[in-house]
Every structure is written in C-alpha cells, then in structure tokens.
C-alpha cells in the first residue's frame, strides 16, 4: 500500500509539473508572437549590400493557387537573387505554369530544371539537385510550392541572417481561404503548432520546418550538400541539425511562412498530421510520451486528476475550467499569429478548435499503428532514427 501511495503521489507531482510546463509554453509563445511576429525590423545592412540568394523551388503538380503563389516570388523586391524552378517529370503540368511565368518575367534571373537527379529516397531532394548544383549565391532559400510571399519577405529573412546565424526559418501559417477545412488548418497552425514551435526555438531546442528556410550554402556543403540528406524523408530536421552541430544559430523571420494551397480538405489535413506524427515518432522516440500529454484534453485529465489527488478538487470541474482557459489562450495565440482580423467567426473557431483537439488521439494512434507513409512520388517505410526505405510495387 505504501508503494502504491508513493506512486500516486509521484504521478500527482508529475501532473503539477506538467501544468507549469504547458502554461509556460502558452505564455512564452503568446509573448514572443506579440513582440516578434508581423513586426518590421530595422535593416541590419544597406539594401544594395544584401547578400545574393538562390531560391530553390520544388514543384510537383498544380493546384488553383500555384501560379499566383509562384508569381509572388517573381515580384520580390530584393537586389540580387535567382529563381531555380525544379520539376521532376517532363509531363508535369507545373512545367507549363513555369514556362508561362518565365515568359511573363523575362528580365528576372530564373531557370527551369526538369528531370531531377536520383541521389536517394527523398523525392524532394532528388528534384532539387540540378538546381542546387548550379546555385551561384552564398545563401540558399528552399521554399515549398504552396507558399506565397510579400515583396519584402526575402529582405526580412536576409536581415535576420546575421554573422553567427546559419539558418533563418519562417513559422508555418495558413492564408485566409474559404471553407471549414481552411478554418481547421488555420486554427491548428495558429494555436497548437506555434505553441510548440515557438517554445522549442526560444528555449534552445532546434525546431524547424522546411516550408521556408534560408541557409548558408557553405555550411550545407560542409555537411555533404543536399545529397547527404537524401536518405531521410524529414530532410528539413536533419539539415537544421547539421547546421546547429557546426555551431551556427537559428533565427525566426518576423513574417510567417504563408501556406496557400488551392487544394485542401479535412481528410487531407488529417493525413498530413498523421504523416508528420509518424516522422516525429521515428526521429524522436520521446514523442511517444511527450506528444499526447501536451494536447489539451489529455493534459487536462492528467492535471485534473493531480489537482483532485492533492487538493481534493472536483476532477470534472477542473477539467472543464482548464479546457476553457486553454481555449481562450489559444484564441489569443491565433490572433497574434494572424496579425489582424480573422476570416471566420468565433463560433467557427470554437467548432474547429474542438474538432482539432478531438482528432489528436486518433492521429497519434494512427501514426503508431502503421510506420509507412505516402508522400510525393511513392510510399516509404520509416526506420528508427529518421531514415526510410522506399516500398516498390511488384
């Protein structure tokens, strides 16, 4: 009995620690968002002396927003950059979109590469290799096809690339679009994701997504170039790790990495979340424990039980109050990331928030159940440590 009492006491203390950790993350991410995001920073160097940038753009397929997203890069206000458009297949409809933009902006330093180069299992790396090999500037900007930018986005990122910084990344967010699936995505990328993403980066953990990353080419080459990361599916994590291991710091851009895909649905969002969870579990096995207990409903149950065990408070009353506080702070976080009025009502937010939180356990269990993922051009079986093998159809 004494052992059981000791174990319960330990679990209760764990619940209290969890409470303070999670609410520290809430406050930290909200404060950082308010102080840093969507703020115009002072120029660190004269406009004319900004370093040259080679933009690598991996493309596969088209969606209704692709041409508009790509065009924002041709309209960047930056003194010296090149656009390297990379398409894997000759018959990909993205080729025609690229040719149309190249014809519309003949004075821009832009090139189209078709065919890729097979150097590993990662299809994104394979696609980017021809562009990377001819990139002529010291800074490499890898930016996904679904991202749109403002004219001064690259200037903002380049100003963050100070002497000791080796990588500048943008916090992923989602543009205003119509429909509930768009609201669901916006709620996730404005609440749960930035809470973890910002807290990790501010406290020294290297958390980077590859949607929009500006990196020093020299440092990547020291790590073996893009080819060194072709064995991984989550190449962005391992590129960031290689840069950090060489003593370089990271900086977050003041502008978000604005996702603006023209194709979206609840099922696509769910599949994407499951794929990301699978990658995190295989790269960082501690995710198996940390991820579920960092979500609202599970955390509220654990903390509510701890409050009942220590203070004899009613579990369900505490659970409801804790969830309500979480819900309110998430809304504050979302408004901060948005940087302006939301495109949906508070009722839409409440419904999307509840559905997103309710999906978390299903997403996590689905990720544990099956270690294979479908991504871009194939299916892959993940291995512990982040490597993968392609599953070939027989």
From Swiss-Prot:
Any single Gene Ontology cellular-component annotation: Golgi membrane
Pathway, per record: Lipid metabolism; sphingolipid metabolism
Chain location of the short sequence motif D1 per the record: 92
EC number: 2.4.1.80
Coiled coil feature spans: none
Location of the active site: 236
Single Gene Ontology MF annotation: ceramide glucosyltransferase activity
Compartment annotation: Golgi apparatus membrane
Record family assignment: Belongs to the glycosyltransferase 2 family.
Keyword terms, alphabetized: Developmental protein, Glycosyltransferase, Golgi apparatus, Lipid biosynthesis, Lipid metabolism, Membrane, Sphingolipid metabolism, Transferase, Transmembrane, Transmembrane helix
Tissue expression as described in the entry: At the late gastrula stage, weakly expressed ubiquitously. As neurulation proceeds (stages 15-16), expression moves towards the dorsal structures: involuted paraxial mesoderm and neural folds. In the tailbud embryo (stage 28), expression is restricted to the notochord. At later stages (stage 35), expression remains in the notochord and also appears weakly in the cephalic region.
Reactions the enzyme catalyzes: an N-acylsphing-4-enine + UDP-alpha-D-glucose = a beta-D-glucosyl-(1<->1')-N-acylsphing-4-enine + UDP + H(+); UDP-alpha-D-xylose + an N-acylsphing-4-enine = a beta-D-xylosyl-(1<->1')-N-acylsphing-4-enine + UDP + H(+); N-(9Z-octadecenoyl)-sphing-4-enine + UDP-alpha-D-xylose = beta-D-xylosyl-(1<->1')-N-(9Z-octadecenoyl)-sphing-4-enine + UDP + H(+)
Superkingdom of the organism of origin: Eukaryota
Topology Cytoplasmic: residue spans: 33-195, 305-309, 370-394
Reported function: Participates in the initial step of the glucosylceramide-based glycosphingolipid/GSL synthetic pathway at the cytosolic surface of the Golgi. Catalyzes the transfer of glucose from UDP-glucose to ceramide to produce glucosylceramide/GlcCer (such as beta-D-glucosyl-(1<->1')-N-acylsphing-4-enine). Glucosylceramide is the core component of glycosphingolipids/GSLs, amphipathic molecules consisting of a ceramide lipid moiety embedded in the outer leaflet of the membrane, linked to one of hundreds of different externally oriented oligosaccharide structures.
Protein name: Ceramide glucosyltransferase-A
């Amino acid at each position: 009995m004494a052992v059981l009492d000791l174990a319960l006491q330990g679990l209760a203390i764990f619940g209290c620690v969890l409470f303070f950790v999670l609410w520290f993350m809430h406050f930290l991410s909200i404060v950082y968002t308010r102080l840093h995001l969507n703020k115009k920073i002072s120029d660190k160097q004269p406009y004319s002396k900004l370093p040259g940038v080679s933009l690598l753009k991996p493309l596969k397929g088209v969606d209704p927003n692709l041409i508009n997203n790509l065009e924002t890069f041709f309209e960047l206000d930056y003194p010296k950059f090149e656009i390297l458009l990379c398409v894997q297949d000759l018959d990909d409809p993205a080729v025609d979109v690229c040719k149309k933009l190249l014809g519309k902006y003949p004075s821009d330093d832009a090139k189209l590469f078709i065919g890729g180069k097979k150097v590993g299992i990662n299809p994104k790396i394979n696609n980017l290799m021809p562009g990377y090999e001819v990139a002529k500037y010291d800074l490499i900007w890898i930016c996904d096809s679904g991202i749109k930018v403002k004219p001064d986005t690259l200037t903002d990122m380049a100003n963050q690339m100070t002497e000791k910084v080796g990588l500048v990344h943008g916090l992923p967010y989602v543009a205003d679009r119509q429909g509930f699936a768009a609201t669901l995505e916006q709620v996730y990328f404005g609440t749960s994701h930035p809470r973890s993403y910002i807290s990790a980066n501010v406290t020294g953990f290297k958390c980077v997504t590859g949607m929009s990353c500006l990196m020093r080419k020299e440092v990547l080459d020291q790590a073996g170039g893009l080819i060194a990361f072709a064995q991984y599916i989550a190449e962005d994590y391992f590129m960031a790790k290689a840069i950090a291991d060489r003593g370089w710091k990271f900086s977050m851009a003041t502008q978000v990495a604005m996702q603006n895909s023209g194709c979206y649905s609840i099922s696509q969002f769910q599949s994407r979340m499951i794929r990301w969870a699978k990658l995190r579990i295989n790269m960082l096995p501690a995710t198996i424990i940390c991820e579920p207990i960092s979500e609202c409903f599970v955390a509220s149950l654990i903390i509510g039980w701890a409050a009942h065990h220590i203070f004899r408070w009613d579990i369900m009353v505490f659970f409801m109050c804790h969830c309500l506080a979480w819900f309110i702070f998430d809304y504050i976080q979302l408004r901060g990331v948005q940087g302006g009025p939301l495109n949906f009502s508070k009722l839409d937010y409440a419904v999307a928030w509840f559905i997103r939180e309710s999906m978390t356990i299903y997403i996590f269990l689905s990720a544990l159940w099956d270690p294979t993922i479908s991504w871009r051009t194939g299916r892959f079986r993940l291995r512990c440590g982040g490597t993968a093998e392609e599953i070939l159809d027989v």
